[in-house]
Amino acid sequence: MQAIILARQDAATGLLPASTAITVHGDYTHAWVRDNVYSIFAAWALALAYRREDPPLAVPLQASVVRLMRGLLTAMMKQSHKVERFKHTQDPLDALHAKYSTQSGDPVVGDSDWGHLQIDATAIFLLAL
């Protein structure tokens, strides 16, 4: 648990990187929305299981889930202006970004440089709130 989940979570933003690899194909240390949303549910489910079987182990996982949800929400709130535009245009260029810097929560690619329209991941995240 510590080595796989908690050690990889950024201390400042709470976001998890997609990987720790930087290869010729790209920098995978960024936080993808979909990966972080699924990580939220995985850590939450694990925390629920530990809460019943071994309560002291549940505490750091619960804190990890809160940090991760706050980090993702903060990254999305930095782009609130895009949400308003997207409501009117429904243009993928106005969609929330799909990947963020793990260290700052800021977008790491431009609006037209990546397929940002990931409404499914954003919707699941909002339901979890």
Segments (PLM) and residue ranges:
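Acidic, mature catalytic/reactive cores of soluble proteins
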Residues: M1-L129
